[in-house]
């Protein structure tokens, strides 16, 4: 009997070991800025971090999404874990709002260029933010920012899915009141019913046209609306 139990346990361990780590995701429900920051900064091990926002959260500082070093980070060669964050609303009243007076970006997506081996082979890691069923309000009726609401740099991807609204973003100096793409490897994607509205900047309201270096798919609201 003991041998049979041991055999079953060994078989179970072997099956679990075959489950890819990248297939897992975990979800946190947040109601405050501190909870949102904490959930976004979790060590993801290449898994997706899913966050549900309940109510309205005021953002008074830039929230960074960046890959984290693997356990090889202290060695001469290293790689990074991708950091992929999905933020959705608990209901129709869920919002992320710029705090009055805060002029920086609400989110900054910056990937990393890792290196591995004697030849220095590239191993880029990605920073990704997906918004769905939630409104992000840039607070442009009260504050004119100096940066776009969402700054997307190297190896960064911003995706707006069904129900995502990026609105009321007003910015000086930087191209794009709502989204700024600042590297050839950055990307902005809009799908389904996602929309941008009432955004304004020196160069392009939502996403600048002809003033960015990244890729954009589905071109909507590229000027002041």
Where are these regions (language model features)?
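Sec-dependent signal peptide cleavage junction
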Residues: 18-28
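Beta-strand-rich solenoid/repeat architectures in extracellular/passenger domains
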Residues: 87, 91-103, 129-146, 161-175, ...
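Acidic Gly/Asp/Thr-rich repetitive segments characteristic of extracellular carbohydrate-active
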Residues: 26-52
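Extracellular beta-strand-rich solenoid/capping regions of secreted or surface-exposed proteins
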Residues: 58-86, 96-132, 138-158, 172-173, ...
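Positively charged n-region of N-terminal signal peptides that target proteins for export
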Residues: 1-5, 9
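Hydrophobic beta-strand segments of well-ordered beta-sheets in folded domains
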Residues: 26, 47-55, 83-86, 129
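Bacterial N-terminal signal peptides
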Residues: 10-17
């Amino acid at each position: 009997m003991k041998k049979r139990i041991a055999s079953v346990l060994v078989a179970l361990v072997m099956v679990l070991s075959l489950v890819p780590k990248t297939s897992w995701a975990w979800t946190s429900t947040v109601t405050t800025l501190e909870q949102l920051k904490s959930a976004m900064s979790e060590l993801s091990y290449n898994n997706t971090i899913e966050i549900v926002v309940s109510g309205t959260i005021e953002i008074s500082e830039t929230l960074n999404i960046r890959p984290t070093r693997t356990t090889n980070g202290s060695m001469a060669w290293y790689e990074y874990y991708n950091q992929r964050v999905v933020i959705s609303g608990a209901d129709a009243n869920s919002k992320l709002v710029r705090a009055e007076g805060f002029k920086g970006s609400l989110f900054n997506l910056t990937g990393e260029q890792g290196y591995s081996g004697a030849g220095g082979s590239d191993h880029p890691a990605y920073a990704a933010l997906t918004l769905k069923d939630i409104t992000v309000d840039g607070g442009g009726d009260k504050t004119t920012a100096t940066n776009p609401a969402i700054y997307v740099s190297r190896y960064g991807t911003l995706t707006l899915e069904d129900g995502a609204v990026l609105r009321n973003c007003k910015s000086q100096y930087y191209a794009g009141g709502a989204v700024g793409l600042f590297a050839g490897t950055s990307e902005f994607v809009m799908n389904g019913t996602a929309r941008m509205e009432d955004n304004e900047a020196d160069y392009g309201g939502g996403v600048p046209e002809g003033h960015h270096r990244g890729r954009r798919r589905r071109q909507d609201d590229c000027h002041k609306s």
